[in-house]
Amino acid sequence: MDPAVSIRDCRAEDCTEVLRLIRELAEYEKVPEQVKISDQGLFQDGFGQDPFYKCLVAEVPPERRSKGGHTIVGYALYFFTYSTWKGRNIYMEDLYVMPEFRGKGIGKRLMRTVAEIGLEKGCTQMKFSVLDWNQPAIDFYLGEGAVDLTAAEGWHVFRFEADAMQQLASK
């Protein structure tokens, strides 16, 4: 693990950099067109009157900046949810580290910090999803003790997009 990397809470002024990393993750996941949020949207949703998410960033000192000149090199975005069976949960929406900084324990530190926050808040589970083709991420999570709920319990994740939500709500 690189002691020069600091893990800290995201600040409002980090939203542009976090959006850059969100776009990099979407590119890696082969769905760049799916990113519709703006840095203003991230700011409002994370730092407005009714915050919907929390975020951690991994930051390197200026002398260790990325090839592109960035000091924020990774992030973990999370929020709290609830299980009627288990109680409080924490959901890690994204975990991403820039490719040139991978293999240095940064992702593990980000994930560990999310777990620590969840435990401090009384959470009994930490949930997240992974694309079925992303074997490096699957192997990483399994190696850290995560359980693949699709394989182990047969759970599938569903979602309604906004138009389907509108249709459902108007029935």
Predicted segments, located by residue:
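C-terminal "cap" of GNAT-fold acetyltransferases
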Residues: G122-K171
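Helix-loop element at the rim of GNAT/NAT acetyltransferase active sites that forms part
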Residues: R20-Q34
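Active-site rim helix/loop that mediates acceptor-substrate recognition in acyltransferases
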Residues: V31-C55, V60-R65
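A short beta-loop-alpha structural element at the N-terminal edge
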Residues: S6-V18, V31
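Conserved acyl-CoA
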Residues: M98, R109-Q125, V147
